[in-house]
Amino acid sequence: MGSLSIWHWLIVLLIVALVFGTKKLRNIGGDLGGAVKGFKEGMKEADAPAAEAQQRELPRNGAVDVEAKEKTPRSGDYR
């Protein structure tokens, strides 16, 4: 008695279809599907820069060759 059976859901669905009409429900479903698709594409675009940043990250255990172009004296480094 506490939970709704399949018959309750079918009656609710029938009433909703009668109130809104099938064309309006179809439009709402299409809009909802487009919104979900746009959300998924946005999530993929948001994850792309993070993946690129991980690829550009320097290796932690490897040596990195660098070349200094100009030496600047630090404060307290007098000769």
UniProtKB/Swiss-Prot annotation:
<dbReference type="GO" id="GO:0043953">
    <property type="term" value="P:protein transport by the Tat complex"/>
</dbReference>
<keyword id="KW-0812">Transmembrane</keyword>
<feature type="region of interest" description="Disordered">
    <location>
        <begin position="46"/>
        <end position="79"/>
    </location>
</feature>
<dbReference type="GO" id="GO:0008320">
    <property type="term" value="F:protein transmembrane transporter activity"/>
</dbReference>
<keyword id="KW-0813">Transport</keyword>
<comment type="similarity">
    <text>Belongs to the TatA/E family.</text>
</comment>
<keyword id="KW-1003">Cell membrane</keyword>
<keyword id="KW-1133">Transmembrane helix</keyword>
<keyword id="KW-0472">Membrane</keyword>
<keyword id="KW-0653">Protein transport</keyword>
<comment type="subunit">
    <text>The Tat system comprises two distinct complexes: a TatABC complex, containing multiple copies of TatA, TatB and TatC subunits, and a separate TatA complex, containing only TatA subunits. Substrates initially bind to the TatABC complex, which probably triggers association of the separate TatA complex to form the active translocon.</text>
</comment>
<keyword id="KW-0811">Translocation</keyword>
<dbReference type="GO" id="GO:0033281">
    <property type="term" value="C:TAT protein transport complex"/>
</dbReference>
<dbReference type="Pfam" id="PF02416">
    <property type="entry name" value="TatA_B_E"/>
</dbReference>
<feature type="transmembrane region" description="Helical">
    <location>
        <begin position="1"/>
        <end position="21"/>
    </location>
</feature>
<feature type="compositionally biased region" description="Basic and acidic residues">
    <location>
        <begin position="66"/>
        <end position="79"/>
    </location>
</feature>
<protein>
    <recommendedName>
        <fullName>Sec-independent protein translocase protein TatA</fullName>
    </recommendedName>
</protein>
<comment type="function">
    <text>Part of the twin-arginine translocation (Tat) system that transports large folded proteins containing a characteristic twin-arginine motif in their signal peptide across membranes. TatA could form the protein-conducting channel of the Tat system.</text>
</comment>
<keyword id="KW-0997">Cell inner membrane</keyword>
<dbReference type="InterPro" id="IPR003369">
    <property type="entry name" value="TatA/B/E"/>
</dbReference>
<dbReference type="InterPro" id="IPR006312">
    <property type="entry name" value="TatA/E"/>
</dbReference>
